[in-house]
C-alpha cells in the first residue's frame, strides 16, 4: 500500500510540474504573439512605407532622436536600471539591445545579473555584443553613447570606448552575499582594533560601506525577466527601495517593452515606508 501511495504522489507531483511548465510556455508565447501583432500593425499605422525611403542611415538617426526624446519626456528617469534574468536560456543579443536602449534614453548605469553567474563568466562576450548592437542600432551616432564595464570592487574599467557616458556592471550572487560579509568583517576588525565601538555600528555605517564596494548608486528600477517570483539574490541590501517590474522574458524584448516599463516607473510614487 505504501508503494501505491508513493506512485500516486509521484504522479501528482509530475502532473503539477507539467502544468506549471505548460502555463509558463503559454505565457511567454502569448506575449510573443501579441508583440508580433503589434509589429505587424504598427508600421502600417505610422506609414512605414515612407520611412523606407530614408534608408538604414536615416532610420538609425530617426530612432536615435526618438529614443533620446523619449527619455527627456519622462517625468522621472532612473539613474540606475538593473536587468535581472531569471530564465535558464540566455540571449546575449537581446540583453545587449536592452543595454543600448537604456543608454539611448539617458540612463547612466545598467547592471546585468543572472543567478548562475553566466554573464559574469562571459563578460567579454557581453561587451562585444553591446558594442555590436550599439553600432547596429545607433549607427554613426554611437560614439555619443560610450559604455564601459566596471570591475567589481575597483574604480578601474575592463573595457572603455572613448569618453564614458554609461556604465555597465555585470553581477552574480556573490556580489550580493560577499559584499555584506566583507563589510561586516571590516566593521568587526575596526571594533577589534578599537577604531570603532559597537555603538558606532548602525545601518547607515553598513550602508556606506556597501555603497563604496559597488562604485555605482543603488538601482532605482529592476526589470525582472522570467516567471520566477524571486530576485534570486540580486543585491539584497541595495534594492530595499527599488521599484521592481516583472516582464515575461528578455528574449525578443522590444524597445517599446522597455519604454513601457520606464513609463510605469515614472508614474510610481515612492512612499519610503510611509
From Swiss-Prot:
GO terms for molecular function: ditrans,polycis-polyprenyl diphosphate synthase [(2E,6E)-farnesyl diphosphate specific] activity. GO terms for biological process: dolichol biosynthetic process; intracellular cholesterol transport; protein glycosylation; sprouting angiogenesis; swimming behavior. InterPro entries: Nus1/NgBR (IPR038887), UPP_synth-like (IPR001441), UPP_synth-like_sf (IPR036424). GO terms for cellular component: dehydrodolichyl diphosphate synthase complex; endoplasmic reticulum membrane. It catalyses: n isopentenyl diphosphate + (2E,6E)-farnesyl diphosphate = a di-trans,poly-cis-polyprenyl diphosphate + n diphosphate. The keyword Membrane applies. Its cofactor is Mg(2+). Its main location: endoplasmic reticulum. It is a multi-pass membrane protein. The chain crosses the membrane at residues 1-23, 33-49, 95-113. Pathway: Protein modification; protein glycosylation. It comes from the Eukaryota. Its EC number is 2.5.1.87. Pfam families: Prenyltransf. It is found in: Endoplasmic reticulum membrane. The active dehydrodolichyl diphosphate synthase complex is a heterotetramer composed of a dimer of heterodimer of dhdds and nus1. Nus1 seems to exist in two topological orientations, a minor glycosylated species with its C-terminus oriented towards the lumen regulating NPC2 stability, and a major fraction oriented with its C-terminus directed towards the cytosol where it regulates cis-IPTase activity. With DHDDS, forms the dehydrodolichyl diphosphate synthase (DDS) complex, an essential component of the dolichol monophosphate (Dol-P) biosynthetic machinery. Adds multiple copies of isopentenyl pyrophosphate (IPP) to farnesyl pyrophosphate (FPP) to produce dehydrodolichyl diphosphate (Dedol-PP), a precursor of dolichol which is utilized as a sugar carrier in protein glycosylation in the endoplasmic reticulum (ER). Regulates the glycosylation and stability of nascent NPC2, thereby promoting trafficking of LDL-derived cholesterol. Belongs to the UPP synthase family. This is Dehydrodolichyl diphosphate synthase complex subunit nus1. It comes from Danio rerio (Zebrafish). The lineage of its organism: Eukaryota, Metazoa, Chordata, Craniata, Vertebrata.
